[in-house]
Amino acid sequence: MSIVSMKQLLEAGVHFGHQTRRWNPKMAPYIFTERNGIYIIDLQQTVEKLEQAYEFVKKLVMDGGTILFVGTKKQAQESIKEEAERCGMFYVNQRWLGGTLTNFKTIKTRIQRLKELKRMEEDGTFEVLPKKEVIRLRKEKERLQKFLGGIENMESLPSALFIVDPKKEAIAVSEARALEIPIVAIVDTNCDPELIDYPIPGNDDAIRAVKLITSKIADAVLEGKQGEQFEAAEE
């Protein structure tokens, strides 16, 4: 039983690539045809590659691994947050802060600061501070929450990344590659699939297409978690 049907992929517009002049020749094997100046992605390969990515994610999570969902473009922001939260994983959906992976130690100090500000707000510290100071601290907290909220509970580096549009998230890709962290990604016709361990050829510009594929990766996480609980119960 396939995890996604051709009908679902077609309805979500996963097969629509970019204009033919905006393409990466390395994506040629995943292109089915060209129609009205737009490349059409071979959905049979999308199904195949999505199944491979699904199995990889499921097994990784079953072994106790974690996934960081990354998508900062408008069409991906909501799906990335919703699906990562649904499966209990981490996400970056605003801006990728350089060094999120390669300089994780520094990022962790910013996360600590966010937690400290939240504590101050909750334990009444804000109430005894001067008004101007409180306004400044609240602004700082909101900014940190915006950029780091999705990785607030990420204690160590993730086991893998799931990326929507690796061309846009080039910094995240290069950091993951430098640290040899595997990457699963939706690759459109303008991307370089060779930079990705588990490329899923598909439209990265349509909200429905992004949502469909991201939700399948989240499903893989949830299935992996069930397997992990099952194994723990057997022990």
Curated annotation (Swiss-Prot):
Pfam families: Ribosomal_S2
NCBIfam families: rpsB_bact
CDD domains: RPS2
HAMAP family: Ribosomal_uS2_B
Keywords: Ribonucleoprotein, Ribosomal protein
Family annotation (PROSITE patterns): RIBOSOMAL_S2_1
Coiled coil (residue ranges): none
Superkingdom in the source lineage: Bacteria
GO cellular component: cytosolic small ribosomal subunit
GO molecular function: structural constituent of ribosome
Lineage: Bacteria, Bacillati, Bacillota, Clostridia, Thermoanaerobacterales
Protein name: Small ribosomal subunit protein uS2
Similarity remark: Belongs to the universal ribosomal protein uS2 family.
